[in-house]
Curated annotation (Swiss-Prot):
Gene: IAT2
Modification comment: Five disulfide bonds, which are essential for the inhibitor activity, are probably present. Exists both in a glycosylated and in an unglycosylated form. The glycosylated form is a potent allergen.
GO molecular function: alpha-amylase inhibitor activity; serine-type endopeptidase inhibitor activity
Primary location group: secreted
Assigned GO CC terms: extracellular region
Protein name from the UniProt record: Alpha-amylase/trypsin inhibitor CMb
SUBUNIT field: Heterotetramer of one CMa, one CMb and two CMd chains.
Organism: Hordeum vulgare
Family per similarity comment: Belongs to the protease inhibitor I6 (cereal trypsin/alpha-amylase inhibitor) family.
Phylogenetic classification of the source organism: Eukaryota, Viridiplantae, Streptophyta, Embryophyta, Tracheophyta
Keywords carried by this UniProt record: Allergen, Alpha-amylase inhibitor, Disulfide bond, Glycoprotein, Protease inhibitor, Secreted, Serine protease inhibitor, Signal
Length: 149
């Protein structure tokens, strides 16, 4: 029969391996989608302007949605919420946003639309939460976010 210390050591080893496996699953590197010098999600900018600001963009209306949803679908599930936060940008740094202040369509209106891009009525894409929703999309929540960053 194994001694108590051997059983404790085995239990500790099992727990460490479980925690390591869980950490590896949730540690997708989202840097490529949040550290780019170019405007993130360029097709989504057109789609947001169409839907939130009623601005006509080049091409048929469905094309902007199709391209935006395609760009979002190409981002790993674990990184979609973080990429949308990066696209929205901080209010204090509008120059680092994919959104522009437009006459009659402030960034806040556009940000409200960005928050729902992954939902069933729009792109219907799962996120880090295994649902088509992003939690903690208000800037004051970003430091306490549920998505990895």
């Amino acid at each position: 029969m194994a001694s108590k210390s051997s059983c404790d050591l085995l239990l500790a080893a099992v727990l460490v391996s479980i925690f390591a496996a869980v950490a590896a699953v949730g540690s997708e590197d989202c840097t490529p989608w949040t550290a780019t010098p170019i405007t993130p999600l360029p097709s989504c900018r057109d789609y947001v302007e169409q839907q939130a600001c009623r601005i006509e963009t080049p091409g048929p209306p469905y094309l902007a949605k199709q391209q935006c949803c395609g760009e979002l679908a190409n981002i790993p599930q674990q990184c979609r919420c973080q990429a949308l936060r990066f696209f929205m940008g901080r209010k204090s740094r509008p120059d680092q946003s994919g959104l522009m202040e437009l006459p009659g369509c402030p960034r806040e209106v556009q940000m409200d639309f960005v928050r729902i891009l992954v939902t069933p009525g729009f792109c219907n894409l799962t996120t880090v939460h295994n649902t088509p929703y992003c939690l903690a999309m208000d800037e004051w929540q970003w430091n306490r976010q549920f998505c990895s960053s």
